Amino acid sequence: MAHRGPPSAPKRPGPTAPDRSFQALLPPCWPRSWPLLLLLLVLVAACGAMGRSPQPGRQGPGVQITRLLPAGRTESGDRKDPQARESEPSVPGLGPGSASGPSTDGAPAPGKGRRARAVPVAGAASASRAQVSLISTSFVLKGDATHNQAMVHWTGENSSVILILTKYYHADMGKVLESSLWRSSDFGTTYTKLTLQPGVTTVIDNFYICPANKRKIILVSSSLGDREQSLFLSTDEGATFQKYPVPFLVEMLLFHPKEEDKVLAYTKDSKLYVSSDLGKKWTLLQERVTKDHVFWAVSGVDDDPNLVHVEAQDLSGGYRYYTCLIYNCSAQPHIAPFSGPIDRGSLTVQDEYIFLKATSTNRTKYYVSYRRSDFVLMKLPKYALPKDLQIISTDEQQVFVAVQEWNQVDTYNLYQSDLRGVRYSLVLENVRSSRQAEENVVIDILEVRGVKGVFLANQKVDGKVTTVITYNKGRDWDYLRPPSTDMNGKPTNCQPPDCYLHLHLRWADNPYVSGTVHTKDTAPGLIMGAGNLGSQLVEYKEEMYITSDCGHTWRQVFEEEHHVLYLDHGGVIAAIKDTSIPLKILKFSVDEGHTWSTHNFTSTSVFVDGLLSEPGDETLVMTVFGHISFRSDWELVKVDFRPSFPRQCGEDDYSSWDLTDLQGDHCIMGQQRSYRKRKSTSWCVKGRSFTSALTSRVCKCRDSDFLCDYGFERSSSSESTANKCSANFWFNPLSPPEDCVLGQTYTSSLGYRKVVSNVCEGGVDLQQSPVQLQCPLQAPRGLQVSIRGEAVAVRPREDVLFVVRQEQGDVLTTKYQVDLGDGFKAMYVNLTLTGEPIRHHYESPGIYRVSVRAENMAGHDEAVLFVQVNSPLQALYLEVVPVIGVNQEVNLTAVLLPLNPNLTVFYWWIGHSLQPLLSLDNSVTTKFTDAGDVRVTVQAACGNSVLQDSRLVRVLDQFQVVPLRFSRELDTFNPNTPEWREDVGLVVTRLLSKETSIPEELLVTVVKPGLPTIADLYVLLPLPRPTRKRSLTSDKRLAAVQQALNSHRISFILRGGLRILVELRDTDTGPQRPGGSGGYWAVVVLFVIGLFAVGAFILYKFKRKRPGRTVYAQMHNEKEQEMTSPVSHSEDAQSTMQGNHSGVVLSINSREMHSYLVG
């Protein structure tokens, strides 16, 4: 389980000589709180396409730029014939001309500016709009022509300082060989190259900016031999630096988010150090630390700001989650908030939540801690069976996760949590995903910034990718409405439901750049992205579309993708074409993309590597980074829009717009929200103090403010039931929670819960009057005894830690009788409550039967563990028919998951016998000579690996079997796991009992392995009474079952409201067993009215004629005849037969019997 942030770039081999065709390495993991955010722009040499920035136009604090040699370009490229290098056509909708720069060829002298006047769209602008005036200033970083990477930091916050670090990174050596540090104090008009050590060559690998005080900067330098490193510290935005040596090799630094002088250092040998004086002195905190899994305390959540969360390797080689305070980490032992080992790289600390995962016996479990409480299992739908889980969002006290379920390959399902992040409900299926370098996963979902609750996602169904949008955090999703006309005013002929707008959210071929959808917190409702119109998303189509009302209406603005930058809270939109050829045209809009103008930001076409503005998008100054040719120096062009906006905006310069969804509903997330935007006729600056949110009004609650609670699914059968939530077949809402204590009460869910961040009040309350139930005294259930480490084979005299767990039932009043099999017996209380293991060791080799019996006034449970004591498989499941007849052969099958290709020995224990049956096959056949409950236990041993499972079998004299089948749709949702089959059987039993009033203990439904999904229903007879040899009640029960099945009244709900029908199965269509030694036998018995004695005599003779096969026939009534007919059953699961009657009961009429006899 990992966070969704951009991964580190892989190292690629490069030439030994200086070359710019290197793949940049993204700097170490940068938390969201860091001001130095790196923008990696990759120019892909293979295809000649310019890479896209992680967030094009992302104001920075820091940007890393890599320039590569595009296809078709020569290294000798120079500034000759710029017109030949740029032949960008005029864009429809743009002005008929552009403001021209100096007519002389070549770049201006450093710091020399040019003033230009942009021409707007003809007929679309007022007279004042023709006065757009921009100032472009170009500066060349002389002497850095060989440098192939650049990192940029714009301090912001009323500061005019910009720092640029250029460096030559050698891919083969994996290190920086040359570097230059440049500083500007006038918003990028001029730059000064800094000399850190006069007369000494200094190589800077990286620099880090303190988020709590951006004036404080740390440079990390190294010698060419990588044998020593130094830090250069500045407290005045890089005006001066002081050098301090460090006794280790720095891999990454991590500033404290609130306290400006505290910083963590992760070293190349996986050690973690801390400094409280801005890197002057260091203290070792922890060794064997996992990279990128170190976290400072979260303000407002962790009690002490000096706390550090760490994932580290312990002495045994496993990984643990530790916390410690930086002042006494070495003096006191570390605290382990999670008791057991965790998976490497799984620890994530994010806002109020901590996530981790732990895998044992080939099963992965995901845990969450809310506000540093105890870790609990994340409750996904029972049969989601996740293969992977990615954290999408944790804001607004709610968790969004993407889960790849057992039957998914390149898609994930999106789930939304409750407040504590424990219980999850499905909100969107089949979100497209791609796995990138270093096994990082990219999920095609994007949170629209600036408007809470709005998400875009690309859904992949049947190979088609379509874009959907939600305004209420996933409760409802809609397609994007297409514009009626294109950018030239021509009809698009795109009509729903056959045609919609689809957007590229993320690019699968480059994980180090962001998607092409641009949103900003400072510009709510403004979304600009690349995509196409049609029935699905087309990868090679990158037309640019924009919306200024948060996705309600869209307009096409360009035919090709552009780099986009928002300035002054979206008051100005700047765009530069994303292309591999040099250019000099900047397009911009001052009216939210309705009209566009062009500006020549430089006289000579340049290869654009990136765009940057001051952090916060609050100014009207931007910088274009590029280079004239492959061997030229870096060129920075400052574009200043401030002359066009001479005054600060006032209240009369704004108009308001109301947020609505695609249905025109104003109440979104429980409130009506209005925002301010600048009027198109107002030429003014919004400024730093501008706030877009205008008003909000709380709405009354409606059905649409609620979604289905955990364990429930929304029906999709009809519009009238579209908002109805029904319990899933595996979920019983009346069952008390596992932590329900006697004397307390619990709330039974009605199937609905309000979205956590929804603020509606009054109105409809689907959660009203929840059922308050008293916690009953629960009998112990799910009792387990195991050896810590999940093994059942140990060495003699080795300490063994027995762990007893109880999944359900009261623990305070339960007593536990423990027998370790070698003479040690003891009685415990609170054994499962304390979690303390039982320490023991065995002196002699052998097999020991360890048993634990838990008992209270409500009932008891027993767990058995056979311990093999020798010197020390994975998942094991024992499949056995739960009901069998006396002296009837039954097949016991041990299912190993995964199947072990090596030789495996199976040990079978039946009853309390200590002498097992041994087999090399995973199945054995046996008989039970006496009626009663018999426990069957199997162990699978392969080398020193031993696992076991146990089942209870009911051995009876008489019972009846009814074959069942299900709707074909169930096969699609059948993961073919024993637990799934067991749950389906339980729900069928419960439904039949409710419909027929037959006690559940007299009905047992067994779902068979494999496809198609079929089952057998076992109808048990009541206990025999001395005064009656035969009970007519059994006939009535059977008739009631048949009537309920024939009338199609037995069904249950699957995901999406799919209803599964349970019916009688035609035994002729069931799977056949080759050989037929253990199946049902076809026998027809005629019940002749008035000739009962003759019928009984015939039955008796038939039974005597076929020894070893018994038939039981019952008289039903005069209007209906019954016959019993055993038929052959499937190879993969033993269908049981009763001792004195056959395994299938069929009710037929005279015509059916005649057809059967004749056929």
Curated annotation (Swiss-Prot):
BNR repeats mapped onto the chain: 182-193, 232-243, 273-284, 468-479, 545-556, 587-598
Membrane topology, Cytoplasmic segments: 1100-1159
Stretches with biased composition (Low complexity): 54-64, 89-111
InterPro entries noted in UniProt: Ig-like_fold, PKD_dom, PKD_dom_sf, Sortilin_C, Sortilin_N, VPS10, VPS10-sortilin, WD40/YVTN_repeat-like_dom_sf
Transmembrane segments: 1079-1099
Main location: membrane
Tissue-by-tissue expression: Detected in Purkinje cells and pyramidal neurons in brain cortex, cerebellum, dentate gyrus, striatum and hippocampus, and in glia cells in dorsal root ganglia (DRG). Not detected in neurons from the dorsal root ganglia. Detected in hair cells and supporting cells in the organ of Corti, utricuar maculae and cristae (at protein level). Detected in brain, lung and testis. Detected in the inner ear in neonates.
Listed result of changing F630N: Introduces an N-glycosylation site and disrupts interaction with NGF and BDNF
SMART domains: VPS10
Region Disordered, residue ranges: 52-120
Keywords of the record: Cell membrane, Cell projection, Cytoplasmic vesicle, Disulfide bond, Endosome, Glycoprotein, Membrane, Postsynaptic cell membrane, Repeat, Signal, Synapse, Synaptosome, Transmembrane, Transmembrane helix
Compositional bias per record (Basic and acidic residues), positions renumbered to this chain: 75-88
Cellular component GO terms held in the UniProt record: cytosol; dendritic spine; early endosome membrane; perikaryon; plasma membrane; postsynaptic density; postsynaptic density membrane; recycling endosome membrane
Origin: domain of life: Eukaryota
Site (Cleavage): R117, A118, R1030, S1031
Phenotype caused by lack of the gene: Mice are viable and fertile and display no obvious phenotype, but their neurons do not display growth cone collapse in response to proBDNF. Cultured neurons from mutant mice display longer neurites than wild-type neurons, and the frontal cortex of 12 week old mice is hyperinnervated with fibers from tyrosine hydroxylase-positive neurons. Mutant mice display mildly increased spontaneous locomotor activity; contrary to wild-type, treatment with amphetamine decreases their locomotor activity.
Disulfide bonds: C324-C329, C494-C499, C649-C684, C667-C699, C701-C760, C708-C725, C740-C775
GO biological process, one term: long-term synaptic depression
Membrane topology of the entry: Single-pass type I membrane protein
Processing and modification events after translation: N-glycosylated. Proteolytic cleavage removes a propeptide, giving rise to a 122 kDa chain that includes a cytoplasmic tail. Further cleavage gives rise to a 104 kDa chain that lacks the cytoplasmic tail, and a membrane-bound 18 kDa chain. The 104 kDa chain remains bound to the 18 kDa chain.
Segments in the Extracellular topological domain: 50-1078
Note: SORCS2 expression is decreased after the onset of symptoms in mouse models for Huntington disease (HD). SORCS2 does not interact with wild-type HTT, but does interact with mutant HTT containing a long polyglutamine stretch.
Family under the similarity heading: Belongs to the VPS10-related sortilin family. SORCS subfamily.
Subunit structure: Homodimer (in vitro). Heterodimer with NGFR. The extracellular domains of the heterodimer bind the precursor form of NGF (proNGF). Can also bind mature NGF and BDNF. Each chain in the receptor dimer interacts (via extracellular domain) with an NGF dimer (in vitro). Interacts with the precursor forms of BDNF (proBDNF) and NTF3 (proNT3). The cytoplasmic region of the heterodimer formed by NGFR and SORCS2 binds TRIO. ProNGF binding mediates dissociation of TRIO from the receptor complex. Interacts with SLC1A1. Interacts with VPS35.
Name of the molecule in the record: VPS10 domain-containing receptor SorCS2
Naturally occurring in which organism (per UniProt): Mus musculus (Mouse)
